[in-house]
C-alpha cells in the first residue's frame, strides 16, 4: 500500500456527513486501476453495519468460497466483504513470545504506533498464507502420564506473505 492513493485516513464509521459506500467504492476503484482479477474486502463489524444501513435492503449477497466451504457474505460491485473482528485490524502488531518478562501471555497485541483499520481491499491472490509445523513429538502410552493413550505434541505457526511486487495492490482505510 505504498503507492499514492492506496491509503485513506480519517474515516470513522457513523460520523454524520460520511459515506461508507463511497469509501469502499473508492478503494475498489483504486485497486482495479492496477489489477483485473477477483478482489476481497476484510472489514470491521462497525464498517459493515454502516454500509448495510446506507444500503438498507439493497446490499447484494455473494458466495465466498474458501477451502471447499461456501459462505454467503455481503458484497459491493462483486467484491465480497468479510467481517473481521476489530482486534485483528491494526496497522502494526506486537508479537509476544510467551517467555520474556511482560510477554508471558503470548499471542499478539496492538503495537504502540498502531492505528485501527476500517477495512482493506486486495486481490484474492495478493496475500499468501503459509503454515509451518515444528517437529512432532510422539509419546507412547507407557510414557504418557496423563492418559493410557498415545499423545502427539507439535506447534503450528502461521504467516501471511505479500510479495515485494504486490504491496501496491492493497488499499487500506485507516480510522
Predicted feature locations:
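Extended, solvent-exposed, turn-rich assembly/linker loops in the middle of proteins
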Residues: 2-73
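Sequence/fold signature of self-assembling virion shell proteins
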Residues: 5, 9-12, 54-175
